[in-house]
């Protein structure tokens, strides 16, 4: 059962499907930390965010499509640094990269990432960051496998 998977820029009509995949991603992530529990209307906020950024030159929203179904997506942006503090003026931020359960471990995530990194490179961005849950071993393994290196650890205190 090999299906051709196409990686392409997201279109407005893809937004509800991406929002559904976002729900799947968040439900997957909450098993590692309850902090990732989504709100009841979180998917609508996600859809609104994507709608606001889909045509933005500083955003790259890609989808993986198989048999006319969206099976993965990657949401990324160019972020600005304070030029008075850091030599690096801009960097790439990957907010989400998700592949639906039945299509995982088939190289789709890596293909989405490669195309995203290529987009950043064409924009003159040479550093890309991603936030990974510390207890999500499968995500940490994926990001390490594709060349990412830990550089900061965020900590929290519940009061």
Feature annotation, model-predicted:
Residues 110, 122, 134-152:
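Conserved active-site alpha-helix within GNAT-family acetyltransferase domains
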Residues 63, 69-78, 93, 98:
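Conserved beta-strand in the GNAT
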Residues 120-131:
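Conserved GNAT acetyl-CoA-binding A-motif
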Residues 1-16, 24:
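Conserved N-terminal entry element of GNAT/NAT acetyltransferase domains
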Residues 49-62, 93:
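A short helix-loop-beta-strand connector motif used in the catalytic cores of GNAT acetyltransferases and
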Residues 80-94, 104, 126, 150-152:
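A conserved beta-turn-beta hairpin within the catalytic core of GNAT-like acetyltransferases
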Residues 27-49:
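Conserved GNAT-fold acetyl-CoA-binding loop/helix
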Residues 96-99, 105-118, 145:
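Conserved acetyl-CoA-binding loop-helix of GNAT-fold acetyltransferases
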């Amino acid at each position: 059962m090999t299906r051709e998977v196409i990686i392409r820029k997201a279109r407005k009509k893809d937004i509800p499907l991406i929002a559904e995949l976002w729900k799947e991603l968040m439900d997957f992530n909450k098993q590692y930390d309850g902090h990732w529990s989504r709100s009841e209307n979180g998917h609508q906020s996600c859809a609104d965010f994507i709608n606001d950024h889909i045509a933005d030159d500083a955003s790259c929203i890609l989808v993986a499509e198989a048999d006319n179904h969206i099976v993965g997506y990657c949401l990324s942006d160019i972020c600005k640094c304070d030029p008075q503090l850091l030599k690096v003026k801009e960097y790439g931020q990957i907010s989400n990269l998700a592949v639906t359960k039945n299509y995982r471990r088939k190289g789709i995530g890596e293909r989405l990432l490669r195309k995203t990194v290529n987009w950043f490179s064409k924009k003159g961005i040479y550093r890309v960051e991603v936030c990974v849950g510390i207890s999500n071993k499968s995500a940490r393994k994926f990001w390490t496998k594709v060349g990412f290196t830990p550089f900061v650890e965020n900590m929290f205190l519940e009061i």
